[in-house]
Amino acid sequence: MEIIYKICMVIELLQLSVNNGYDEYNMLQNIEKSENGFTNEVKGMPFDEYKQWLKKEDDYSKSQNLPDNWIPQTTFFLNIDGIPVGIGRVRHYSSEYLEQNGVGNLGYGIAKPYRGKGYGNILFENLLIKCKLLGYKRIKLFPYINNISTNKIMLKHGAKLLGTINDEKHIYEIEI
């Protein structure tokens, strides 16, 4: 019997594009509409509407067609060996309104088939780099207290607990 070891993987954090297709769409079907505070509008959406959603999200990254009180944000897909496994968003700056409502500077989700493989940690690390490139010195995050995996990832990256919101969300700050 021949044993083959995989010694490396190709990790890519790719900015959402209007040209994204079925691979990303299918991955998004494996993340709930609202799970642990992360919103996935694409769950259950027909593919033709998904293409319109891509355009809307691309516009948001360019500060175009934003709803009132929204901050520009860029959406990224995490690909491992060419396969989309997760999605993340980075807001271009912070606001008092978002913080008062427990909305952090970044958010992410990993598709169910790919959980428990360390991809959440990889995605989070790469989103922190994007935050730094946007000029953040520190970010605030508001994970649900019962979201054990995300809390562990944030603490691993130096999150300092500042408090809680209504006994359901932690308030963390990370210096980057």
Q: What residue ranges belong to the model's regions?
A:
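GNAT-family acyltransferases
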Residues: 2-105, 166-176
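Loop/helix-junction capping segments adjacent to catalytic residues or to phosphate/diphosphate-binding pockets
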Residues: 21, 117, 148
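Short coil/turn motifs at secondary-structure junctions
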Residues: 93-95, 113, 146
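Conserved acetyl-CoA-binding loop-helix of GNAT-fold acetyltransferases
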Residues: 108-110, 116-129, 152-156
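Conserved GNAT acetyl-CoA-binding A-motif
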Residues: 133-142
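Conserved beta-strand-loop-alpha-helix junction that forms the acyl-donor binding cleft
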Residues: 141-151
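Conserved catalytic-core motifs of GNAT/GCN5-like acyltransferases
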Residues: 142, 155-174
